[in-house]
């Protein structure tokens, strides 16, 4: 089952925003940022989504711009010994969706501009 989490972003006068919320667990499958039609986050805004307990960075996107976008984030995988898993033909890393182990997530915005707004959608399944 896929869960849709909606985060309404509203920066303060210094361009910052932060909120923390629980997640039951799953994988971060996709995210989408939609700017407000009249007061979008600044072009140089940074979005971070981090595990509140582990500090694991699920999203770290800088200078997001002022148009809507969607991403399907993936993390590099490794074998049981910790060596990078690579595709044999190309040597490119094998990637997979990051697992969220039932911890709280913190969404932070930096450099967002004075009292700017937008919406971040997270699909976790």
Label each region the model flagged.
Residues 1-125:
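Surface-exposed, low-hydrophobicity beta-strand/loop segments enriched in small/polar/acidic residues
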């Amino acid at each position: 089952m896929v869960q849709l989490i909606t985060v309404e972003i509203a920066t303060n006068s210094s361009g910052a925003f932060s909120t923390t919320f629980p997640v039951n667990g799953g994988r971060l499958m996709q995210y989408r940022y939609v700017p407000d039609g009249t007061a979008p986050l600044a072009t140089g805004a940074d979005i971070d989504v981090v595990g509140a307990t582990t500090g694991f960075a699920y999203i770290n996107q800088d200078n997001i711009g002022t148009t809507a976008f969607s991403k399907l984030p993936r993390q590099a995988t490794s074998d049981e010994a910790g060596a990078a898993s690579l595709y044999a033909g190309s040597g490119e890393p094998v990637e997979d969706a990051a697992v969220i182990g039932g911890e709280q997530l913190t969404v932070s915005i930096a450099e967002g501009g004075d009292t700017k707004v937008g919406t971040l959608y997270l699909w976790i399944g």
